[in-house]
């Protein structure tokens, strides 16, 4: 299981706090998770909201994104996330004024940009190969998990690299699962479990293990971390790192849509140094 360290950054307002996950990936592949603390946004988005689609003041969001880019010293690459299974490839430098592509996964071999996934309960999943030649990031709520966003992201990595051995390449992948809502706080209906059953991305026993029945009929508590880990393992990815940090419980550091509805988004980032 990964551990993390915390850094305090001087933002000119209050100290911005970021988390640096520790994992077994190549040393020149870097990870960073932002928090709520230390940005320019006013309540209810206070204060380091990085999402443009939540009705926050756009000038505040741009200042918050600039703060993040200054810390990483790379150009940003964000997605217009819509709970899809679409994956895009970043093959040339992205101009900051261009609209973000509509997708929920991205791969890149460029060392000029960082990839950022915005969440407030969904899973951010960051990936790289064992040599550190390619990085990827995807946004995975229950719909994305059930419909194959992880599979599509890894498929895009394989198709870009064209390794001699597809399975050997996949087995060498490293995955980091960032903060998201924990099972005890994520109640879902029967239709969510049925979606996983119908799509058969993992076995029935694994699905049952990730859905704990609630006292109410046709209600379950779903384990997004467990589902993502099972999917990755099924594909052959066993170097999976997560701290299982709960975005719902940790109101000091993370935004949570289930907790607050009108709220911001934090970012999980990966890049090649």
Tell where the protein language model's regions lie, with residue ranges.
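Active-site microenvironment for binding and transforming phosphate-containing groups
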Residues: 1-273
């Amino acid at each position: 299981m990964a551990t993390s360290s915390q850094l305090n950054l001087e933002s000119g307002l209050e100290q911005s706090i970021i988390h640096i996950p520790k994992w077994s990936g190549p040393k020149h592949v870097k990870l960073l998770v932002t928090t709520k603390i230390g940005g320019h946004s006013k309540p209810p988005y206070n204060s380091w909201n990085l999402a443009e689609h939540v009705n926050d003041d756009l000038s505040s969001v741009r200042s918050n994104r600039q703060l993040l880019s200054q810390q990483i010293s790379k150009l940003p690459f964000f997605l217009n996330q819509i709970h899809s299974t679409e994956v895009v490839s970043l093959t040339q430098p992205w101009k900051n004024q261009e609209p973000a592509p509509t997708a929920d996964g991205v791969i890149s071999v460029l060392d000029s940009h960082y990839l950022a996934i915005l969440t407030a309960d969904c899973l951010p999943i960051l990936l790289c190969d064992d040599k550190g030649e390619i990085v990827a990031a995807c946004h995975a709520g229950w719909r994305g998990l059930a419909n194959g966003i992880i599979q599509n992201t890894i498929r895009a990595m394989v198709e870009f690299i064209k390794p001699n051995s597809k399975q050997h390449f996949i087995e060498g992948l490293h995955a980091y699962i960032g903060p998201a809502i924990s099972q005890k706080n994520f109640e879902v209906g029967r239709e969510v479990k049925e979606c996983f059953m119908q799509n058969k991305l993992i076995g029935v026993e694994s699905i049952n293990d990730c859905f704990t029945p609630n006292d109410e009929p046709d209600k379950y508590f779903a384990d997004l971390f467990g589902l993502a880990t099972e999917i990755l393992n099924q594909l052959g990815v066993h170097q999976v790192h997560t701290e299982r940090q709960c975005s719902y419980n940790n109101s000091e550091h993370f935004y949570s849509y289930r907790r607050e509805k009108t709220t911001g988004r934090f970012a999980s980032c990966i890049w090649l140094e």
